[in-house]
Amino acid sequence: TYVIAEPCVDVKDKACIEECPVDCIYEGARMLYIHPDECVDCGACEPVCPVEAIYYEDDVPDQWSSYAQANADFFAELGSPGGASKVGQTDNDPQAIKDLPPQGED
C-alpha cells in the first residue's frame, strides 16, 4: 500500500484524491491518509502529488517512517467506511500529526 508523509501536512493539494480510482484517500484536518485495506496499489496517486509526499510503504524515506504508523492510527479510529467521499474531512489526525508545528509555506 502507499503512505502519505510529512510534505502533505498543512498542504493537502488533493490532486491524489482526484486521481484515485477507488476513493481510498481520506482527509484529516492537517493531511491526507491512504486506507491500507481499500488501496489497490495502482500507484496513480504518487506521480500527481506536487509535493512528493506519497511513497510505496517499503520506500518511505527513513526520516518519515513514522508516517506509516500515523496512517494506521488514523484508520484505527475511523475504521473502514468503504470510500472517502462518504466521510468527508475528519478531525481525527493522530496525536503525532496534531503535535507537529505548522508546515508548508509561510
UniProtKB/Swiss-Prot annotation:
Domain called 4Fe-4S ferredoxin-type: residue spans: 30-59
Reported cofactor(s): [4Fe-4S] cluster; [3Fe-4S] cluster
Region described as Disordered: 81-106
InterPro entries in alphabetical order: 4Fe4S_Fe-S-bd (IPR017896), 4Fe4S_Fe_S_CS (IPR017900), 7Fe_ferredoxin (IPR000813), FdxA_Actino (IPR054830), RnfB_subfamily (IPR050294)
Binding site for [3Fe-4S] cluster: C8, C16, C49
Cofactor note: Binds 1 [4Fe-4S] cluster. Binds 1 [3Fe-4S] cluster.
Binding site for [4Fe-4S] cluster: C20, C39, C42, C45
Origin: domain of life: Bacteria
A Pfam family reported for this protein in Swiss-Prot or TrEMBL: Fer4
Gene Ontology MF: a single term: metal ion binding
Swiss-Prot/TrEMBL keywords: 3Fe-4S, 4Fe-4S, Electron transport, Iron, Iron-sulfur, Metal-binding, Repeat, Transport
Stated role: Ferredoxins are iron-sulfur proteins that transfer electrons in a wide variety of metabolic reactions.
Entry protein name: Ferredoxin
Species name: Mycolicibacterium smegmatis (Mycobacterium smegmatis)
